[in-house]
Amino acid sequence: MYKKVNLSGIVISEPKSVKKFKTKDSIVNVLPEYYHTIADKRLEIRKDKDNCWFCKQDMNTYNPYFIETLYGDHIGVFCSKICRDSFANMIKSVIALREEPKISLLPLELYEKPEEVLEVINDLRHKEGIYGSCILESDKNIIKLTLRCHCNTN
């Protein structure tokens, strides 16, 4: 299908654009010898499916959403896309995600009245095409939550 080419000690056997990753292995720690690892554990991911991992609402009445990793694994259980994307935004620097989150809410512990955020989550649960984020207005010590959607969506 493709031809093997030798270039002065460099072997190109697969074009990069069609190369498939064969393993999930990655370099975990590359440290100079003067650093010593003081904690190295392999921990299982939580298996709780009763409550939303972001807002802690009971999942019995909602269709579950989950975060999909680059390798096709599923992480978490969420009551809405808003919760899923907000949680994904918090972990995307550590876990390779299949798609970029579109919404970024801060954890509910930061809000004086988290029930106001839960109301927004519940009101927009089934709405498609939502994107947005939160900004801390430090001079007023207020969190400005701004969510938008495209005009042609429900």
From Swiss-Prot:
Q: Which family does it belong to?
A: Belongs to the chordopoxvirinae VLTF-2 family.
Free-text function comment from the UniProt entry: Acts with RNA polymerase to initiate transcription from late gene promoters.
**Which Pfam families would you find in this protein's record?**
Pox_TAA1, zf-FCS
Which GO terms label this protein's molecular function in UniProt?
zinc ion binding
Keyword vocabulary terms for this entry: Activator, Transcription, Transcription regulation
Supply the name of the protein: Viral late gene transcription factor 2
Q: Describe the subunit structure.
A: Interacts with itself. Interacts with the late transcription factors VLTF-1.
Q: Which InterPro entries match?
A: Poxvirus_VLTF2, Znf_MYM
